[in-house]
Amino acid sequence: MTEQVQDENKLIAERRAKLEHIRENCPANGHPNTFDRKHKAADIQAEFGNNTKEELEGMGIVRSIAGRVMAKRGPFLVIQDVSGRIQAYAGKDVQKDLKAKFQGLDIGDIIGVTGQLHLSGKGDLYVNMEEYELLTKALRPLPEKFHGLTDQETRYRQRYIDLIVNEESREAFIMRSKVVSAIRNFMVKKEFMEVETPMMHTIPGGASARPFETHHNALDIAMYLRIAPELYLKRLVVGGFERVFEINRNFRNEGLSPRHNPEFTMMEFYMAYSDYKDLMDLTEEMLSSIATELCGSPKLPYGEHVVDFGGPYARLSMLDAIKKYNPDNATIQSMTYEEVKDVEFMRNLAKSLGMTIEKFWTCGQLLEEIFGETAETQLMQPTFITGYPADISPLARRNDDNHFITDRFEFFIGGREVANGFSELNDAEDQDNRFKAQVDAKDAGDDEAMFYDADYITALEHGLPPTAGQGIGIDRLVMLFTNTHTIRDVILFPAMRPQG
């Protein structure tokens, strides 16, 4: 047992003894639930922060606050609530009563205070403690003041401590909430209807990913946590709901990385009588307005860069992007779609770039992997990449001029994909053939290939109007709005490997 652990255990024992004494002298068994908190720290600071000491004393303002004790400086306590911090002052009479009744107040305890508002000699607002109550005794100490909670893994595993002591974390999750609310408000103003679709599917679909499998005992069938809501949302468009969206969780049984968490949040939407170009226009409008609304400017700092959400955003095909970011590769510079269709040519190109390839990769998969290897991380500013091959876009409509590619884009910012959208494939026979090709790919070893969904084909046979749909990764978008570089910093409780 380390000295640090011994010290912590000693502090915990001391606090438990204090709680036991409190229980012996408190009718609420040490956890009262009757304090009426009427005011928040930030509201008090905003309303009275500019008053002089004399003005406050003359006004006789009484305020009732509650929160966690974050510091003790002589007779002063720093109390933190959800809005911020404010001081409370314990005069001599109060200090004496506090000691007799509670046998010592510790950092981390939650208290309620009522009293008159004053200004300290240093110009700080404080509440003079006329009434007070210990609401919750903290049995464990907070991290030391100067060391804080610096271990990243502990921050993720014990997010409750992280939120108490790290203002940056609190601000990041407040921003996350604002981003989600702003997106929802934008969609409603655009006359989209918010819906909820199943989280458990009998057939996983809507994306190329490995699902989590579970079992429904009553029905005695295998079920899958959804990897995407796409096929259900498009069924609703078939049913006549022309503009729908859903903000919810998706689950993909894949690896962990700074960009990936197996449980993540997606906003997916579909609009009838539109195409993928309409989606790009809508995305520009949405992100520009949200950035300006929440941050006061469409230009946001991100690492060493400044990301400009103001638009217009760059648009180029996947093939052109590969050429742009490989200017000295003669083979790439002369490459045409005819060569992209040649799987041996693409295999040799990938190998020449030092890439490890899978034997079942198609021409489209090879093109996408080369793009990811050589171009994706260069896309710092908002960029729509178009021209995705049909063999990696089984739900997207083929391009009228080039049937090898589809009317699909992925949206990149900060060197990573944030959104994926396309004109929907509404040809039931073409969709049937593409599902069958996905089954063949799965049989060949591609774990992420899609399953065949007969009911979705039946829905298409009833007629899906010309439709465009898009999914936006909320977590990755929030990373940009909070200037964070790992997805775990914007997910309250990210997936972690079990300890021990």
From Swiss-Prot:
GO biological process terms held by the UniProt record: lysyl-tRNA aminoacylation
Protein location: Cytoplasm
Cofactor note: Binds 3 Mg(2+) ions per subunit.
Primary enzyme class: ligase
Molecular function as annotated in GO: ATP binding; lysine-tRNA ligase activity; magnesium ion binding; tRNA binding
Cofactor(s) it depends on: Mg(2+)
HAMAP family referenced in this protein's UniProt entry, alphabetically: Lys_tRNA_synth_class2
Oligomer status and interactors: Homodimer.
Protein name per its UniProtKB record: Lysine--tRNA ligase
Organism in which the protein naturally occurs: Shewanella sediminis (strain HAW-EB3)
Taxonomic lineage from the root: Bacteria, Pseudomonadati, Pseudomonadota, Gammaproteobacteria, Alteromonadales
